[in-house]
Amino acid sequence: MTLNLNPLETNLVNLVIVIGLLFWFLRGFLGGILERRRAAILQELQDAESRLKTATENLSQAQSELAAAQQKAEKIRADGQARAAGIRAEGEKRTISVMAAIKAGADADAEADAARIKDSLRREAALAAIDKALAVLPARLDASAQAKLIDSTIKNLENA
């Protein structure tokens, strides 16, 4: 073997050897680093997909629960409105009934007062007529008229 002292050829061989060694060494080293990084990225992607799937399922479940809660709230609101309308109608009926009873009571009181006043006026009119008749009677009734009146009254009593 002869020693090659040509620097161009020597550097070229050295460069090929160094590049070959670097390629062989770095391929294993960088390949391992890149493979670990690739595995970590794939694992993170799988975790993200799993979290996305779980979040989607949770969202779907929450939306269905929300829809059910909204339906229940709507039913409760409708029931409340119906109950309020029923209570309002019952209150109106009760108020009308009480007002009718009060009016009937007032009418009965007014009729009773009117009847009492009529009776009182009749009594007063009868008493006034009796007083007037008693005042006028002695002057108009002489002995023969009195005898006629007594005879007529006796006949009426006998016929009765």
Swiss-Prot record:
What InterPro entries does the database record attribute to this sequence?
A: ATP_synth_b/b'su_bac/chlpt
Swiss-Prot/TrEMBL keywords: ATP synthesis, CF(0), Hydrogen ion transport, Ion transport, Membrane, Thylakoid, Transmembrane, Transmembrane helix, Transport
UniProt keyword annotation of Oxidoreductase present: no
Membrane topology of the entry: Single-pass membrane protein
Entry's localization field:
Cellular thylakoid membrane
Molecular function per GO: proton-transporting ATP synthase activity, rotational mechanism
Q: What does this gene product do?
A: F(1)F(0) ATP synthase produces ATP from ADP in the presence of a proton or sodium gradient. F-type ATPases consist of two structural domains, F(1) containing the extramembraneous catalytic core and F(0) containing the membrane proton channel, linked together by a central stalk and a peripheral stalk. During catalysis, ATP synthesis in the catalytic domain of F(1) is coupled via a rotary mechanism of the central stalk subunits to proton translocation.
Identify the NCBIfam families for this entry. Answer: PRK07352.1
> How does the annotation summarize its subunit structure?
F-type ATPases have 2 components, F(1) - the catalytic core - and F(0) - the membrane proton channel. F(1) has five subunits: alpha(3), beta(3), gamma(1), delta(1), epsilon(1). F(0) has four main subunits: a(1), b(1), b'(1) and c(10-14). The alpha and beta chains form an alternating ring which encloses part of the gamma chain. F(1) is attached to F(0) by a central stalk formed by the gamma and epsilon chains, while a peripheral stalk is formed by the delta, b and b' chains.
Name of the protein in question: ATP synthase subunit b
Q: Which organism is this entry from?
A: Synechococcus sp. (strain CC9605)
Gene name linked to the record: atpF
